[in-house]
Every structure is written in structure tokens, then in C-alpha cells.
Amino acid sequence: MSELLSDNWATQIEALKERFDREYKHEPFDLPEEAESMPLFREWVSHSLSAKIASPFWELAGFRKDHRCLDIGCGVSFLIYPWRDWSVFFYGQEISSVARDALNSRGSQLNSKLYKGVKLGAAHDLKYDDGIFDRSIATGFSCYFPLDYWRLVLLEAKRVLKPDGVFIFDSIDPASEIAENWAILEMYLGVEVFLTPLQEFNNLIEEVGGKILSTRSGELFQLYKVSFT
């Protein structure tokens, strides 16, 4: 992707980076009283919210031993999820240098065979070669960008996947009971949330040559399993 194209999204990407850098470093957020009075805020502070809304990507991924998997926007995924039990080779890309450094310092210690490192960069500009992954995953962050940005992410995921590879991602369900309040909470934390209708994601997937193999609805997000023609 061109440098100019990256610059079009620089403000939102930087805001998202700062929001998660602070969370990973356990730095306090200076929030107004009305934000701290929200029930979702209390769940967020107790870390119960992330567990409740996280998408179970592995249930749709269909991992097989020695699959090569790229986790886009991986955070500290390799430290949280049982990648070793899945016996797949883990590659990552992340905008947060805090998360990237944490994984690269500990990932190889956990499993030097399966952990292949995390690169720093945004989702629309993957730092990997064409056609090398069996699975690509991007959960928890499509909601921070407009649909035209996600088009670029889909095209990049398609580029790095093998012909028979699949892409697993999620999008926020605007009809979820907690969607609007969650978007408000994230606004207080420094980032904008786009409540894009799910049908628009369905249409976009088709426009870029994708086929929806299956979906799964969660507390806040809908999970997609997509192949490309």
C-alpha cells in the first residue's frame, strides 16, 4: 500500500494505538464521572468485559497441525489463547509496540517452534509475502474503522492467504443490547466506534470476491469465516 493511503487513516490508527498502549501498560484513563458510573465501565475495570465480548475465533478457524496462521491486530494473543494446543505456527502483526514487544520477548520462551514473531504495522499494510498463510484472523478492531478501510483489510488478508486459506474476522452487531453503550465507553477511552450494519459487511465481502462460509453471533460481535475466489 502506498504511503499516501496509509496517511489517510493515520489519525484513527494513532488514536487506537494510544488507547491500547495505555491499557497494556496499565496506565490510568482520566475519565469523567458519567463514564465511570456506566455498568460497562465497571465490567471493563474488572476485566470481565473483555472475556464476555471476545470472539471465539478458534471455533470457526478449523486449525490443523502445522497450519501457518497470521493474527492481525493480535495484541498479546499468544500469551492468552492456547496456541500451543492448536499446534499451528503463529505469526502476528500489531500497531501497539507495547504488545509487539511483550510477545516478541516472551513468545519464543513459551514455544520457540510455533512462535514466529510479531511485526509492527497496521492491518491495511501487512508485512508478509503473498499466499503463505492457511488462516488469517482479525478480531476486535473492525469497529474502529469505516467500511472503506475494512475493504483494504479484506484485500490484504486475501493477498497473504493461500488459495484454500480462510479469513476469520468479526464486526460489531449494532443490534446488540450493549453496542451503543460500549461505543460510548470506547469514545471516553479515546477512540471512535463505527456501528456499521452487518448487511454492509456481507455486501463488502461479496464485492471483494469473498464467500461467507459461516458466521457466529456473540454478545457484541458477529464472527465471520470467509474464503476468497
Give residue ranges: language-model regions:
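Conserved beta-strand/loop positions that form the S-adenosyl-L-methionine
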Residues: 72
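A short acidic, Gly/Pro-enriched loop at the edge of an enzyme's catalytic core
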Residues: 124-136
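A short beta-strand submotif of the Rossmann-like class I SAM-dependent methyltransferase core
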Residues: 138-141
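A short glycine-rich, Lys/Arg-flanked "PGG" loop and its adjoining helix->strand segment in the class I
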Residues: 151-163
